[in-house]
Swiss-Prot record:
This is U1 small nuclear ribonucleoprotein A. One of its GO terms (cellular component) is nucleolus. Signal peptide: none annotated. Residues 108-139 are annotated as: Disordered. Its main location: nucleus. It is found in: Nucleus, Nucleolus. CDD domains: RRM1_U1A_like (cd12246), RRM2_U1A_like (cd12247). PROSITE patterns: RRM. It comes from Arabidopsis thaliana. The lineage of its organism: Eukaryota, Viridiplantae, Streptophyta, Embryophyta, Tracheophyta. Belongs to the RRM U1 A/B'' family. GO terms for molecular function: RNA binding. Keywords: mRNA processing, mRNA splicing, Nucleus, Repeat, Ribonucleoprotein, RNA-binding, Spliceosome. Residues 18-97, 177-250 form the RRM domain. One of its GO terms (biological process) is mRNA splicing, via spliceosome.
C-alpha cells in the first residue's frame, strides 16, 4: 500500500475516512514492537483491520492504522493527536489514500500491475520492491495476532488457595502510592503502560514481572496522585481487555 508519498507535503484538506496516518514516531523502536504498541493504544477506539509500518528508510517514523469505520478513526485523531508515544508526540491525520484492505471490501481495489499502467512516471524495480516490502510488513491485524491477546479469566473463576470460599473476598489494600493493574493482554509492554500513566502527575515507573504476564505495578509519588490515575484509567481497554486497577499490597 503506497500511502507514504500521499501523506507528505501540502495539498487540499483530506476528507474523513477510516484510515489514519501517523508520523513523528520514534524510529528506534523495532517494527514488531511498534505495531503491537500501536494496536494496544488505538484498539480502544474501535476494531482495527490493519496496521501498516515499514522498515524502508523513507517510511521510518510513520504508520497507518485502518479502522473498520470512519467514526473510530475520527475519535482516535481527536484523542491521540500530539499524545506522547515512545518519548515523541504523535502527529495524526486522515490518510489521503485508501488502504488495500478497505478497497477490496468496497469493491474499488485495483491490482498493483494495472495501476502501474496508468502512472505517469514509471517506478520500475523501485516500486516493485516497495510493494514487496508493503506485502511483507503490512500485515492485517486479524492474521498477525490470532489469539495472542487472550483475556485473563474473570476473578470469579480464579481458584482460591486453601479451600477459601469464593464468597469471602480478600480485603482490599488501603490507599497508597502504588497501583496494581490486572487483566492486561499478555503482550502488553511496560512502554504501553508508561504512555497511559505518564499523563498523570506524580508518575514514577512501571514494573512488570516477566514470569507473570497480565499484571503490572505502577508507582506514583504519593497516594493522592495514584488515586487520580486509578480513577482516570479504571476500565480502560487495551485490546478487548478492561484494566482492573487496585491499590497494591505492601
Amino acid at each position: 500500500m503506497e500511502m507514504q508519498e500521499a501523506n507528505q507535503g501540502g495539498g487540499s484538506e483530506v476528507s474523513p475516512n477510516q484510515t489514519i496516518y501517523i508520523n513523528n514516531l520514534n524510529e528506534k523502536v523495532k517494527l514488531d514492537e511498534l505495531k503491537k504498541s500501536l494496536n494496544a493504544v488505538f484498539s480502544q477506539f474501535g476494531k482495527i483491520l490493519e496496521i501498516l509500518a515499514f522498515k524502508t528508510f523513507k517510511h521510518k517514523g510513520q504508520a497507518w492504522v485502518v479502522f473498520d469505520n470512519t467514526e473510530s478513526a475520527s475519535t482516535a485523531i481527536a484523542k491521540m493527536n500530539n499524545f506522547p508515544f515512545y518519548d515523541k508526540e504523535m502527529r495524526i491525520q486522515y490518510a489521503k489514500t485508501k488502504s488495500d484492505v478497505v478497497a477490496k471490501a468496497d469493491g474499488t481495489f485495483v491490482p498493483r500491475e494495472k495501476r502501474k499502467r496508468h502512472e505517469e512516471k514509471g517506478g520500475g524495480k523501485k516500486k516493485k520492491d516497495q510493494h514487496h516490502d508493503s506485502t511483507q510488513m503490512g500485515m492485517p491485524m486479524n492474521s498477525a495476532y490470532p489469539g495472542v491477546y487472550g483475556a485473563a479469566p474473570p476473578l470469579s473463576q480464579v481458584p482460591y488457595p486453601g479451600g477459601m470460599k469464593p464468597n469471602m473476598p480478600e480485603a482490599p489494600a488501603p490507599p497508597n502510592n502504588i497501583l496494581f493493574v490486572q487483566n492486561l493482554p499478555h503482550e502488553t509492554t511496560p512502554m504501553v503502560l508508561q504512555m497511559l500513566f505518564c499523563q498523570y502527575q506524580g508518575f514514577k515507573e512501571v514494573r512488570m514481572i516477566e514470569a507473570k504476564p497480565g499484571i503490572a505495578f505502577v508507582e506514583f509519588a504519593d497516594e493522592m496522585q495514584s488515586t487520580v490515575a486509578m480513577q482516570g484509567l479504571q476500565g480502560f481497554k487495551i485490546q478487548q481487555n478492561q484494566m482492573l486497577i487496585t491499590y497494591a499490597k505492601k
